[in-house]
Amino acid sequence: MTAIQHFFKTFFLTELLKGLALTGRYTFKRKFTVQFPEEKTPISPRFRGLHALRRYENGEERCIACKLCEAVCPALAITIESETRADNTRRTTRYDIDLTKCIFCGFCEESCPVDSIVETQILEYHGEKRGDLYFTKDMLLAVGDRYEKDIAAAKAADAPYR
């Protein structure tokens, strides 16, 4: 670009006019912004949200303390402690997920052989303190008990793709 061309581009503010033209073109078109708390966008059936621990129909926890989810977690967000019961089966005494570390990759859900740990469709949860996002076994079971019908329906809908 020669010095004369550069002078006329900057003197007549052609870049500014191009930017204003672009802005003017989109001023009267449909807006892309969603006002989130009032308006909701559709959620994908494979959305990975809040974690939950599931139970069998008889009320027993599904988790067999194999610790595969703990081993596969790339963020090291899962902590499991277990003990052996009288009938030589293992069950968890501690199952904690630190949601401040979790990257919601879904590896824990994929690795679980008994579909105990699942990621629900829940995306609206919060904590006022950092410790509020540290979910214990009882909290995860409560989430699973509360949303079991939704979790079962999502699992059934996703079954052909697994």
Curated annotation (Swiss-Prot):
Keyword Oxidoreductase included in the entry's annotation: no
Job description of the protein: NDH-1 shuttles electrons from NADH, via FMN and iron-sulfur (Fe-S) centers, to quinones in the respiratory chain. The immediate electron acceptor for the enzyme in this species is believed to be ubiquinone. Couples the redox reaction to proton translocation (for every two electrons transferred, four hydrogen ions are translocated across the cytoplasmic membrane), and thus conserves the redox energy in a proton gradient.
Name of the molecule in the record: NADH-quinone oxidoreductase subunit I
Membrane topology: Peripheral membrane protein
Family listed: Belongs to the complex I 23 kDa subunit family.
4Fe-4S ferredoxin-type domain mapped to chain residues: 54-83, 93-122
Xref: PANTHER family: NADH DEHYDROGENASE [UBIQUINONE] IRON-SULFUR PROTEIN 8, MITOCHONDRIAL, NADH DEHYDROGENASE UBIQUINONE IRON-SULFUR PROTEIN 8, MITOCHONDRIAL
Cofactor note as given: Binds 2 [4Fe-4S] clusters per subunit.
E.C. code: 7.1.1.-
Gene3D superfamilies, alphabetized: 3.30.70.3270
Cellular localization per UniProt: Cell inner membrane
Positions that bind [4Fe-4S] cluster 2: 73, 102, 105, 108
InterPro entries: 4Fe4S_Fe-S-bd, 4Fe4S_Fe_S_CS, NADH_quinone_OxRdtase_chainI
Domain of life: Bacteria
